[in-house]
Structure formats: structure tokens, C-alpha cells
Amino acid sequence: MLIKNYRTQFVQALASIFDEKEIESFFYIILEAFHQLKRVDLVLSPDLKLDNIQLLQWETVLLQLKEQKPIQYILGETQFFGLPFYVNENTLIPRPETEELVEWIIKENLKISSLKNLKILDIGTGSGCIAISLAKNLPNASVFAIDVSDKALATAQKNAVLNEVDITFIEKNILQTEDLNQEFDIIVSNPPYVRNLEKKEIHKNVLEYEPHLALFVEDNDSLLFYRKITELATRNLSNNGQLYFEINQYLGKETVELLEKYNFKNTTLKKDIYGNDRMIKVNFR
């Protein structure tokens, strides 16, 4: 079968579930993953064919997409900050908003990183996307990453090897940690922050497939992780150290107030590309 003809079937099969742009995105992601071809290749070579084995591969993916399984989990990989990452049901799928957080940290610290060996800690590392992207772009930094899930850490370690960076990974429940036993110049975290009351806003592909441990917090203590990490930061950030958070867009004011209670200074609350409160930076002492 010609790929261009199969494309018509593919689009029709998903039309009742996804919008046209999303289906088109799926098609070209798979085209590149399975055939190392881009959109322009299909335009230039419209007679490209699928053999029976290739057709079966596409149909297998199509069945999973109909169940709204994320394309990143189906293929087992994604891109983040221009780097390749393995992902699975033990790790969140990295978001564009988190890329904005990484970009902010790099811009703020690129110059100082060339002058000193920064120590950076990523709390709740998941796939390792934040820690690895920082290590790749701040090559003089010593990067540490914590997660409570041994399965997530196993994936993060594979991603560190894939991207040729050295990260110190630590399995630890941050909520049961009283001290980190060393000082860091930067602590960054994208902890669980989605309240249970917000589940009605969450799409099926997230709710049914991504790890709830990394997503949700109780409604009556939605800043639990922020409070604990902030407490640790007061003990384990160096002088003039920086604390960065990705935050719940509905809790920007509350998160700022929490940080100010711990006497952090120079609070900066930033919006993401969609205009939502999404990240915070504060300085220590």
C-alpha cells in the first residue's frame, strides 16, 4: 500500500477522537520513527510503499491511539529541549512548559557556570529531563537528581547514558527527608501539583496512562511538596542559592506567599507560553 493512501485511512480512523492537526502530528511522528522520513520526503517521493510488516506496525500503533494511549508511550520515546528521551508509564511525558523552566535556568546561570562549578539538584526527576538538559547545557555543573520511584530512576539513568551526561541519581522520598546533607547552588523541582478537583479538566490520555504519583496531590494540602522542598532549601541552599519551581497555574499567589513565609527574596513569578502562571524563582539570603 502507498503511504499516502494509508494516510487517508489513518486520518479517518482517528477523526472522531482527535482534531486534524493532532492526527497529522501523530502521522508524521510515526513516519519518522518507523521510516526515518520527514513530511518533505513524502512530498518528494509520493510512491513510497508500506510492506505487510510495516503495515502491521502502523495498525498496531493505530489501535493504541484509538484507546488514547499517548504516542510517546506507544513509541517509548520523545524529545525534550532538543534531546531524545525514553519514556514509559513510570515517567511523566515532558511538557513544553517544563522546557521553558529549563531555558530560564540556563539563561540565568550560563555565565556563572563558566566561572564556577555549580551544584544543581532536581527533586522528583522522573525521566530525568530537567537534570539531563541542565547537565547538557551547563557542562561545568555537578547535577544530582532525586526520585521516590526506582522504576522512574532506571529510565532516567538510561536517558543520562543516551545523552552522554553524568548525573548522580538518588532514590529518596523527599517528604520523609529532613536534610539533604550537602549544599546546592540551585534546587529545581516540578513536583506533583494537580489537585484531585482538577481531574475533570484532565484528558483521558493523561488520566489513564500517566503515573498519578507524579501528578496529583490532595485538595486539602495542595502545596505539600512545595512546603517540604522549601523547608529543605532553607537548610541546603548555598548563600545566594536559587530555588526554581514549576507550579500549578491556579496557585501562583499561594505559592509566592508560601515562599515569602520562609523569607526567600527576589521572588519572580513567570507565565508560560499559554499565559498561565507556571514557574517561580527565588533567591536564598
From Swiss-Prot:
Substrate binds at residues 190-193. GO terms for molecular function: nucleic acid binding; protein-(glutamine-N5) methyltransferase activity; protein-glutamine N-methyltransferase activity. Transmembrane segments: none annotated. Keywords: Methyltransferase, S-adenosyl-L-methionine, Transferase. It is an enzyme of class 2 (transferase). Coiled coil: none annotated. GO terms for biological process: methylation. It catalyses: L-glutaminyl-[peptide chain release factor] + S-adenosyl-L-methionine = N(5)-methyl-L-glutaminyl-[peptide chain release factor] + S-adenosyl-L-homocysteine + H(+). Its EC number is 2.1.1.297. S-adenosyl-L-methionine binds at residues 124-128, 147, 190. Belongs to the protein N5-glutamine methyltransferase family. PrmC subfamily. Methylates the class 1 translation termination release factors RF1/PrfA and RF2/PrfB on the glutamine residue of the universally conserved GGQ motif. This is Release factor glutamine methyltransferase. The gene is prmC.
